[in-house]
Amino acid sequence: VAVRMQYTNSTKINSEHLTAESTYTMRHNAFAFGASFVDLEVDVPIGKIKINRVIAIHDSGQILNPALARAQVHGGVAMGIGYALTEQMLFDPETGKMRNDNLLDYKIPTAMDIPQIDVEFVETYEPSAPFGNKALGEPPMIPQAPAIRNAVLHATGVAVYELPLTPERLIHAFIQAGLIQPLSCEHIAET
């Protein structure tokens, strides 16, 4: 719905509402495809992941607005990084209430956490879509967690099967794999 407003010298505003309605029924669902490649470093003793670069490649049909499409992919990559590394809903086991129900405690990535992101599009025409395009809203988020997890596996040889890849989970997996030794209380007392 759009409104055209006409201002006159008086305090009275003349407005005319403009409305339009149209529908388009797709005959079938157009599937978007994407892949991501992640270059990262793992600080094994402290379970810290530093992502250096993400290459995100997407087939979203004909790209109608390249700048907006790139921005959409950047946002999706950032969301995927948060899902893979930090975002986790914690609940109180007795009350069932969410313990991290605010942005101070529920950790989402900031601009400082997002690496260099290179975006490439494979443009294919989708005949069932009105302009030959496909989805580009959520698809860029989806491959990030598997790409990050597989990069950690490639870097360390350790497969982790639960997200997010928090330092606690990584350290536990690295101890189980024998990459690091657990610290004993005696060792801590000596230092």
Map each language-model feature to its residues.
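C-terminal catalytic domains of large/alpha subunits in multi-subunit enzymes
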Residues: 1-191
